A protein has these predicted regions:
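Helix-adjacent hinge/juxtasegments
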Residues: 65-113
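Phosphate-binding P-loop
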Residues: 2-14
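Structural motif
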Residues: 15, 88-90, 130-132
């Protein structure tokens, strides 16, 4: 039997990080549903094929219909600035945002800059903000240049978000573990 740890989200940014189908989105929806104010859901997915369209529909069905939906594949700071600062913001997901930026021919440096600007705007919000992203660095080294670039760029993006997040949770098999920082003293 597993233990239960209570994690209280403050008004800062929370990063939900984990593998595909790990329960990140379900956790975000649960947290959003318990928020007493308005919730804005920013979706970055693009329905490029029937399978992706089905996945998007399922995610839509899982969310409360009263939530405001923003569909923005290239989500940026100007979009975030237009959101009611008292509304909880859920971004699903950073993984697809980074993929979209790569396919929009953005350089690694431009994507790194995007991460710095977006993370600054997200932590400046008054209401809780949840950013969802995949951890893709735990598997094999991709066998092609694009795969390695994606893994590296997303890893850097996640690091920037995590460094500024009030809370970072790793989600696996529907369970969340809080990630902390370690202070090393070699002596």
């Amino acid at each position: 039997m597993g233990s239960t740890e209570s994690i209280r989200l403050g008004s800062g940014m929370t990063l939900l990080l984990g593998g595909a189908r790990s329960g990140k989105s379900d956790l975000a929806v649960s947290l959003g549903s318990s928020y007493s104010g308005d919730v804005v859901f920013a979706a970055t997915a693009v329905a490029g094929d029937d399978d992706m369209a089905d996945r998007i529909r399922k995610h839509q069905d899982d969310r409360p219909p009263e939530w405001e939906l923003i569909e923005e594949p290239l989500l940026d700071a100007s979009t975030i600035d237009r959101i009611d600062p008292s509304a909880m913001l859920i971004i699903d997901c950073i993984t697809l945002l980074v993929s979209n930026l790569i396919f929009a021919d953005k350089t690694n440096e431009q994507i790194d800059q995007h991460a710095s600007i977006l993370s600054h705007v997200l932590v400046s919000r008054r209401a809780p903000t949840i950013a969802i992203s995949n951890e893709v660095g735990l598997g094999l080294v991709p066998d092609n240049e694009l795969g390695r670039r994606f893994r590296d760029v997303l890893g850097r993006y996640n690091n920037r978000l995590s460094a500024r997040a009030e809370t970072a949770l790793f989600v696996a098999a529907g369970r969340a573990t809080q990630l902390g920082t370690v202070s090393l003293d070699i002596g």
